[in-house]
């Protein structure tokens, strides 16, 4: 299990970033929750069966989203999710980080890459996943991300080609030539898609014939009932905790793939509940520590 992207130095840097955060960035971060996670779009199984159109996430290119990630990636680096995603549970006895590594090995296999192939990550964060995929496959990594601070961190990584990582928005045209990439993947940024048809068509355009597009993200399953207050509240709490945007029935996802021209090879549901619980417990401990520091006036309240 050699791949360990988050080092003590990374965590120290994240802590320093949080302790020195500007009032402007702090205020923008706190305000973003009220802007981004209220009345987020949902399409359920019942909607699908009635033929209700898929409704995209309207703030997918917003300044508020960038403000959120400018701060939250520091918080995640303190924990186990510097890579900004909760992996599906592959081995419940192992940590979040180990499950990330196991899951990324699965993704690397699904991408069917050879050494020297070009692979793009949508919503690449600081490039930690891209580094691992490149290590596993020998492919040349590329990445786009909405938050400039995370791209700057990717640029500082000597294991990543700086010129291949850029501030970018998958809700707009991808800055790649037609048929120029061997594979594209996205690990949990896709709930911010504003127009599914546009984004999936853009990915299809930049892929070579036979290229692969792999995504992992949140999806509503058959049992979700929006009329059930308990279920609705649980989803909203999870949305705010894991900062996902839209919540769409999985068959909408499958249809979007096909409509863009893809052949759907596999669609698999994998839960992440146990790992989310582990990470919540870790952040509860951090919260207690930060409250103590604030009480002692070491950090601002």
Regions flagged by a language model, labelled:
Residues 120, 128-172:
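Class I SAM-dependent methyltransferase SAM/SAH-binding core
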Residues 171-184:
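A short acidic, Gly/Pro-enriched loop at the edge of an enzyme's catalytic core
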Residues 4-76:
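N-terminal auxiliary segments of SAM/dcSAM-dependent transferases
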Residues 219-244:
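Short, glycine-/aromatic-enriched active-site segment of Class I SAM-dependent methyltransferases
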Residues 197-212:
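A short glycine-rich, Lys/Arg-flanked "PGG" loop and its adjoining helix->strand segment in the class I
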Residues 245-261:
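Short alpha-helix
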Residues 97-115:
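Conserved alpha-helix/loop element of class I SAM-dependent methyltransferases that forms part
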Residues 263-295:
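Conserved catalytic loop of SAM-dependent methyltransferase domains
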